[in-house]
Amino acid sequence: MLVCIPEVLPKSEVAEFRRLMDAADWEDGRSTAGAQSAMVKRNEQLPPDSDLARALGRRIVSALTGNPKFVSAAVPLQIFPPLFNRYAASGGHHFGIHVDNAVRGDHLTGLRIRTDLSVTLFLAEPDEYDGGELVIEDTYGSHEVKLAAGDAVLYPSTSLHMVTPVTRGARVASFFWLQSMIRDAQARSMIYDLDNAIQALVERLGRDDPETVKLTGIYHNLIRYWAEV
């Protein structure tokens, strides 16, 4: 399940992020890559332990946990501290096909998560750079994602994916992973579809409609059945 989430951050906040990031020191992005990923990763990254990366990351997590679409699709249990990368044409940056590590650990907080879902939050407008598409492969083929600044995409961490070479400008983004309360991707997808159907019925029939109440009960009972907390 691939879900695009618009306007996670307003344009004004994106501009503030970019101003702070443009003034920061960047390092080789391979510092946080696994052995296989490091072979195909060419980009820059804000030092993950820097005060700036941590502060901006907390703002992103706060925005996402208050976003109903994100919460519905992810059913998040633990969110890894967001990281930040930059793909510049001048550096020939790209990230070849790879799969994310199954487990991520943060040595500052001691947090360890199973990576169920991956998130990319775009911080550069599509017309700022050429190339740099996030290409995600699943059983239905390849999907190219290049969203407006402030928008995010959520997809299974089991997916093979890549970032195509940037040939003009620079692609700036935040990326991170999360552990869902619902481990099984198919179950999580059904929960998301059910929640969307319930919200549509609420709009048409009202929250107090008996059938809407019954479906809401089924939704919560399925969460209770599948959740690992």
UniProtKB/Swiss-Prot annotation:
Write down the required cofactor(s). Fe(2+); L-ascorbate
Q: Which top EC class is named for this enzyme in its record?
A: oxidoreductase
Locate the Fe2OG dioxygenase domain: which residues? 78-180
Q: Name one Pfam family in it.
A: 2OG-FeII_Oxy_3
One GO biological process from the UniProt record?
intracellular iron ion homeostasis
Matches recorded under NCBIfam families: PRK05467.1-2, PRK05467.1-3, PRK05467.1-4
Q: Which UniProt keywords apply?
A: Dioxygenase, Iron, Metal-binding, Oxidoreductase, Vitamin C
Residues involved in 2-oxoglutarate binding: 171
Entry protein name: PKHD-type hydroxylase RPA3479
Matching entries from Gene3D superfamilies are given as:
q2cbj1_9rhob like domain, Rabenosyn, Rab binding domain
- Tell me if NAD is a UniProt keyword of this record: no
Positions contributing to Fe cation binding: 98, 100, 161
Among InterPro entries, the record links this protein to: Oxoglu/Fe-dep_dioxygenase_dom (IPR005123), PKHD_C (IPR041097), PKHD_hydroxylase (IPR023550), Pro_4_hyd_alph (IPR006620), Pro_4_hyd_alph_FE2OG_OXY (IPR044862)
Keyword Endoplasmic reticulum appears in the UniProt entry: no
- Enzyme Commission code: 1.14.11.-
Q: Which organism is it from?
A: Rhodopseudomonas palustris (strain ATCC BAA-98 / CGA009)
Q: How, per the record, is the cofactor bound?
A: Binds 1 Fe(2+) ion per subunit.
- One MF term from GO for this chain? iron ion binding
